[in-house]
Amino acid sequence: MKEKEMIFGIRAVIEAVEAGKDIDKILVKRGLSGELFSELLELTRMHEIPMQNVPVERIDRVTRKNHQGVVAFTSAVTYQKLEQIVPLLYEEGKNPFILVLDGLTDVRNFGAIARTCEVAGVDAIVIPARGSVSVNADAMKTSAGALHSIPVCRERSLKEAIVFLRNSGIKVVTATEKAAELYTGTDMTVPVALLMGAEDTGVASEHLRLSDELVKIPQFGAIQSLNVSVAAGVLIYEVIRQRGELFP
């Protein structure tokens, strides 16, 4: 198990990125500039590492050490690359089953979803590098260790990831209340990627347009939506049901 740690100081952070250390995110003091900052900015873009510009007071709350306006948080897991995972699944003779999460920010929901994915045999989870959850202590705890077992792919562009999946012969099925078709009405015996959004914002419009099919889970009560981890569980086990994998 990897321990999550913090790295302080702009030179130390640059060296960590260059050394290939798995960085979850970097906080940078608002208004920071200079040659070293430009170098760090270029590295974060190259390695697809989320960077946030924040007031210096926020960094001061993290540490009293000489941080020079920069602190990096290492990841508790090693992120995988989708373009490496998918070919490997085909090489192993698997029928790819991937979950894509668009804009999910609740780490406990993420952990619960990861736990379901691991138990159900989902091959990988895809999240965007920015505007999404990170694998922190709460996510690890809620996942009950699942995040150590299932590959997590952090992608710079979710749009490009969806296009890659489709070009790889994987059907992208998106859960949205805007759908006309029920989730039981689409064929998920083929290679499939389930795309789900956050409870409040749903899936981005551009990602909806890229999807092969839109599906919904029927609702009969007054509450407008299911918890996203519950909805993910429903759809994941529908894939298993259709594939005849309920009784291994």
Task: State where each predicted segment sits.
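N-terminal positively charged helical leader segments and presequences
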Residues: M1-L88
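Glycine- and other small-residue-rich loops at beta-strand/loop junctions that grip anionic moieties
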Residues: E5, K29, D102-G103, P128, ...
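Active-site helix-initiating loop/hinge in glycosyltransferases
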Residues: G9, D102, N109, S225-N227
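Structured adenosyl-cofactor binding patch, chiefly the S-adenosyl-L-methionine
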Residues: I14, A19-G20, K141-A146, S205-P248
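RNA substrate-binding interface of SAM-dependent RNA methyltransferases
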Residues: E15-K21, S33, I49, P87-E181
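Short, acidic/turn-prone active-site loops that include or flank metal/cofactor-
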Residues: G31-L32, V56-E57, R130-S132, E199-T201, ...
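Active-site/ligand-binding-proximal alpha/beta "capping" segment
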Residues: V173-N227
